[in-house]
Structures are given as C-alpha cells and as structure tokens.
Amino acid sequence: MSLSLGIDTGGTFTDAVLFDPGRGVVAAAKRLTTKHDLALGIGAAIDAVLEQHPAEIAFVGLSTTLATNAVVEGQGNPACLILIGYPEAALDRAGLREAIGGDPVVAVAGGHRPSGEEQAPLDLDAVRAAVLRHAPAVTAFAVAGYFAVRNPAHEQAVRDLVDDLTGKPVTCGHELTSGLDAPRRALTALLNARLIPLTASLIRAVRGRLDARGIKAPLMVVKGDGSLIADRFALARPVETVLSGPAASVVGARWLTGREDCFVSDIGGTTTDIAILKDGRPLVNREGAQVGGWRTMVEAVEIRTFGLGGDSEVRIEPGIGLAVGPRRSVPLSLLAHQHPEMLAALRRQADRAEGISLDGRFALRLRALDTDTLSPPERRIWDALADGPQPLETVLSSHLLDRPLERLVARGLVILSGFTPTDAAHVLGLHGGWSRDAALLGAALWARRPAEPGWTPPVDAEAFARSVLERLTADSALALVEAALARDGVADPAREARGLLPRRAVAGDPAASDLLRPTLALGLPLVGIGASAATYYPEIARRLGTESVVPEHAGVTNAIGAVASGVLQRAIVTITAPEEGRFRVHAPAGIRTFGSLEEAAAHAEAEARGRAEALAREAGGQEVAVTVTRADRVVSMAGGLDLFVESTVTATAAGRPRMG
C-alpha cells in the first residue's frame, strides 16, 4: 500500500512520519537537524521511518520552522530593496527602516496613483546603476512599487531588468499580496528575498535525499495558512512558508486529538507558537502573519510566535533578572555530546579561581553561505572556527570583534552555545540523551556568577536549573495569556499580559504574597505539542486553570500536519471608480476600464477565477474547485443616493495534493 511521507525540519530536530489517512501514524522518527548540511538530518529521519516500515511513497509533505526562526532571530541573506515612488516617510512605518537594517535600499522615481495611473515615469537608468552597484554584495532583490497592486507595470519592468543584469532572484510585492499597505508590502517582499537561499537549500536537501532513495513522489510544502504548495512554488515565494511549521502543527493537532475548540501551543527548540482552534478550524489572520515583531502581508493561520523554546538562550536582562530567549543557543549538553572536547573546556573554566562573564559560552560555524563577502574581522572569526567550536573568550580576543561576531550570528553563519532550558532539564533528570556533565558544569558556572541588578545567584547548580525552568514555564503561561487577550481584541496584549496580576497568577511560588493570590483561567483546553510538551504543559495548564492535553505522537505533530492538509489558493481582483460612469478592474495582468459595474464585475470574476485555478494547479493541486465572492463598498449619500467606492472579487480554489 502507498503511504504519505511527512517531514518537518525545525531548528533543533528533523522529524519524519509514514502516514495513512485510515490508520494514522505507521512509523515515526526524530533526528537532530544538521544546519551545516540539512540533507544529513533529513536523510537520517527518512531512513529511520523506512527501516521501521518499508513502503511505497505516493506523496511527500514538508513543513519547516526554518523561515520562521530566521525572521524571529533576525537572520537571512543580504538583499537589496528597490522602492519605486515611495515617499521618504514610508520607511518609518511598519518597522520597515528597522527591518532593512544594514541591507542596501534604493529609492527611484516612478510608482502609480490609487487609480492605477502613473504618478511619475519609472527611472530605469537609476535602477540599472543601483543594481550594478549592489549586486555583488547581495543574494537577491526585492521590488516594491507605490500602488503596484493597482498597476504592477513598474515592478514588472524593474524585475525584468534585474533578472537581465544579474540573474539573481527577484521578489515583487504585488506577487505576494493584493493588499493596500505600501510599507508592509515592501517589508514582506524584503523578507521573501532574504529567505530564498535558505528555502532553496532546504528543498534541494529534501529532494536530493528522496532521489537517492528512488522516491519520485511529488514534494509539497506547508504554507502559513496550513495548505500545501508544490516545491517549485515555494522556491519562488518562500515567505509564504513563514509559520509553515506552526500551521502544520495546528493541522496535526486537530487530527491527533479530534478537539474542535482549544488552544494549541507548540514548543520547539527556538520558538513557542500558539494558535486557536474554533469549530475544528484554525483561526486565519487575513491581515497577515506577525512573526518576530514584524507584521507581514502573508495570509496565515492566526499564530502568535514567541522566541521561547527548549534551546532558548539563558541570559540576564539588566535590571530585571533571569530571562529566556528570544535567540536560540546550542545547548551545552548537545555541544559536548557532539564535540566531547568541549567538556574539557568547561572543566577548565570551572577549575579557575574566579569566573568571567564569557564562561560557559562558545561559538561554532552553523552553515557556509556567501562567505566571500565577509569583512576582515568577520573572516578572522570564521577562520578561528574552522576546526570546530571555540570558547568565546578565545574567539573574542579583542573587544573589537564583538560586533563582527554579532553580524555573523545575524547572517546565520555562526551560532552561539550556552546554557538553555534543555540543559536545565538534563540537570534535573527530566531529559536525557546528551551530556548531563556539560549541563551540570554550565549550571555551576552560572551559579557562581556575581550578583547583578534584579538577579541574585542561586545556591547551587540544581537551584539554578529550577529557576530556568520556572522562567520558561511562567513565560509560556504569559504567552498564552497574551494570545487570549489578542484574540479578545485587547489593544496592547503583550503589555497587559505582563502586568503585575498576571505575572503573580502564573508564578510558581504561591507564597509571593500572603494577602493577594490572583488566579487565571483559560476558556479552552490547552493542547501541548512538541518534543518537550509533556515536560512543561501539564504544569502550565494547571497554572492557567484549564485541561491539559498532550497527545500521543506530540513530538512529531508537525510532520503529521504536513501530509494531512490540502491545496488552497486565493486570487483577489479590485474594481474602483476613478470617475462617474467608469469602472476600473485592477488585476495582476493589468488594468481595464468598463462603462458599467456589471461589465467590470464579470471581467473581474473571470480574471480572479482563472488566476486562482491556475495558482492552485501550479501549487500542485488536482480536482480543483473554485468559488467566487464579491463584496461592494457603497456609501449612502444625502437624498437617498448611493456612491460606489470599490468592489473586491475573491476567488478561492481548493484541491487535493497530486499523488505520484
């Protein structure tokens, strides 16, 4: 019998399942993700399930948190953003200027008006000069034109020129969204461009391992809304896989538990992702996914992502105290397991009469990408790590190397190692398999650190480990409170969730106050998934006064979700009225003007229907069915007259994934 193969590649683990809709999970395996060569971890997971149950594979589904993690951690390849006709003030909206960071941004004349008419001629000479200037230092380009969703001509012209001059990937804003919000559209295009090399590396790794095993089945990737797209589609639009892993986890959790209404909280190595199921369906955010503080324009399952996981960096927040995340760190227990010589380095640090701030911290290469563009200080650090991990005190022989190291980390070339909640679980015997000795040494080094404002050193290593897990548990509970408040429409849910009363309600020490002991209660059960869900979520649910559900196969829920979904694509066409008696249709193919609304609507419906069906088939769907809706915006005027403002025609195409 043919089975489906589900794969989930996360920041720490790569999971694989063999799945049959009638029987459920036939075989499952979990292996470490190998960032330096993704194919190794993927191949190991695939081999493990096929050894358990050799089978013919008809379909392969892939979910991944790599894109999500890259956005949360501020990583990604350098990309050049070309803004066409944008006002200078647009850079200060939607966090666009902050998101650009050190990447080149070019503003050129051009763009359109809301009517779709040109506001200024496109300055292709300026584009040509900028592209030739910046191409050697970037891996991709992003193009965003003012009101390009009403007329994409300028974006298309720049895209074609960049392709002719460089051959490098180009992302256009109008290809990703039809929504009106120029800064957020530019932000989404930029994130997409940065993620293209990472996604290409992942898909090549999966396809290579499938080919090596003679598996010729179609490969599809989970989108952020939980639906599936063909691998070639994901290569061009990787930003749509932001929240791929979390979306797959929601689909998988629904399948595993049968729960219709619940919170779904997925704890991974890097992030905790929280979603809500209502009436058996995940809530979808039509306004766009929010990841790592950025509000994109990618339609996705309504998920709140927090930099909080088993491998989150443990640190001191000045004036506040012990903090966990948002950056991922390689657990010391894993580092010493993979590099036993690091255990000796930890012992040397512990044997010193006095500790230093860099004790228990290491750096190692993560992956080799575009290293030809490294600055001399960055190259010095990169070369120092050629033979394996090194203590930070060795790597940072000069304070002048602090910023170059941070840049290498931000680009995803280098990763730091230090104490994490996973290490704390090793110390306390809640987790095993890696080096407990390294975890104990790391905790002991932390326990002897001098006091800082907001933090008093614990009495010993075990006390420190308990404080780390308490911080993770309390922060996870507050993250769920924030998700609930956000869904209830609270204006600033992050601030409200971390007020005095919520913090005291989820605290592990009930004796914090003898006079006031507030309690909180979630209105839905809590489904906890992820490799460490059983360790944390029963206690988190208890503190939040709700039922805890940790299903069988909770550790491979994402891989299950990768093969339990379908194909879904939408196309939106807008109709405006630039003047009385004229109705303009704004479609991806261009604009057309009609003399009546019904003529315009008929054309818009045909455009939307054809576009949605084509996208669904391109995304790998079969047996595609299309539904079309139309929403008119009409304003009532004095005297009983109605004024047409605009109309939105939405076509939704749904189908089953194509089987091999």
Each model region followed by its residue ranges:
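N-terminally biased helix-coil "hinge/interface" segments that flank
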Residues: 1-660
